[in-house]
Amino acid sequence: MCGIAGLVVAPGQAAPSPALGERMNAVIVHRGPDDGGVHADERALLGMRRLSIIDVGGGHQPLYGADRQVCIVFNGEIYNYRELRAGLEKDGHVFATQSDTEVILQA
């Protein structure tokens, strides 16, 4: 089981601080004892507490696209991610992790 925290900033409001994300993650640490991370920008804040199942060492979240324009947190399991990944690799996608979450990001 994992935990996700998030906040979307209304137009004209101040950007959220990463410290707020860390405090939000602290509340849900019991949901994901293995790893945690925070993304904060001027529009949103995403927090993730992870129970590592797939790519235990390399599946840190939030996960970013190669150009850092897209960020994802994901709680779930893609059972056919290896098949999907193989198809994406055939189409030229390059993966940085072994995580099923990155398959979503690359698709």
Language model features: what each stretch is:
Residues 1-107:
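N-terminus-centric sequence/structural signature that marks the extreme N-terminus
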